[in-house]
Amino acid sequence: MKLLLTIALMLSTVMWVSTQQPQEVHTYCGRHLARTMADLCWEAGVDKRSDAQFASYGSAWLMPYSAGRGIVDECCLRPCSVDVLLSYC
């Protein structure tokens, strides 16, 4: 019985892991970056957030992770995911 349960657990784990797709990363530069951002931000219906929203709390740890870098640094100089792009909307 334990063997059957162990095999079933292993099979379900393997099946679950095989269905998990890693998020694709691409480089986005120039017009391709601008068009992609326009499409993503429009589809997400997200308004541009300003750093002032975070700074008003007075804590540096509330600043967004990418506050020191720009979108070109993160997505043109090296590949990035759609989640990273959406964080700039």
UniProtKB/Swiss-Prot annotation:
The entry lists its GO molecular-function terms as: growth factor activity; hormone activity
Origin, by domain of life?
A: Eukaryota
Disulphide bond pairs:
29-76, 41-89, 75-80
Q: Name one Pfam family in it.
A: Insulin
The compartments listed are: Secreted
| Keyword Transit peptide found | no
Quote the InterPro entries the UniProt record gives: Bombyxin, Bombyxin_A, Insulin-like, Insulin-like_sf, Insulin_CS, Insulin_family
Pyrrolidone carboxylic acid PTM positions: 20
The leader peptide range reads 1-19
Q: Where is this protein primarily located?
A: secreted
Spell out the residue numbers of the propeptide.
50-68
Q: Which SUPFAM superfamilies match?
A: Insulin-like (SSF56994)
Q: GO CC annotation: what is one?
A: extracellular space
Q: What are the alphabetically sorted keywords of the record?
A: Cleavage on pair of basic residues, Disulfide bond, Hormone, Pyrrolidone carboxylic acid, Secreted, Signal
Q: Tell me the protein family, please.
A: Belongs to the insulin family.
Subunit text: Heterodimer of a B chain and an A chain linked by two disulfide bonds.
Record's miscellaneous remark:
Silk worm has two kinds of PTTH: 4K-PTTH and 22K-PTTH; there are many forms of 4K-PTTH.
Q: What does this protein do?
A: Brain peptide responsible for activation of prothoracic glands to produce ecdysone in insects.
Mind telling me what this protein is named? Bombyxin A-8
Q: Which organism is it from?
A: Bombyx mori
Gene assigned in the entry? BBXA8
